[in-house]
């Protein structure tokens, strides 16, 4: 059975939707929380919520898609929000699957304020994590390492899977991932090799 690293950020609605589809993936999942903003900075990208028209589309699409999949879903009271404390909470919990799911659900199911300090403190108590544990250097270092590792592996967005040297980005890439796991030649055929070295014919002026 394959072991897959799953990179996610709690700020991402796509990560939440993907979480609820992980049982479709044949393999052992290693949960790797990362700071999406750090990946955006690394690659010089703009987040989808930073472009007004794209922001509205993303919110509408995710709401509709989650409904189609039968996933309980409601955007928090304000978005984007700062996910740093939630990411550290996941790490302090050892990134256990049930803890990751509980954190995601607390953000994406009730339409509440994800940045509310009292709600977050209640969540920490529920998961048995103290403020001191959240602010430990070990927790901070692991989040930084995860984000740096993701960037070094070519991860540019969340959610992303990494397996056998390949990145599969997006909650909608699970079918592609499953095809690769069933037959690695999916990414090793002649056309895929051609795409890897496809020349650039024009570059947009900055």
Label every PLM stretch briefly.
Residues 3-6, 30:
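Short, well-ordered beta-strand elements
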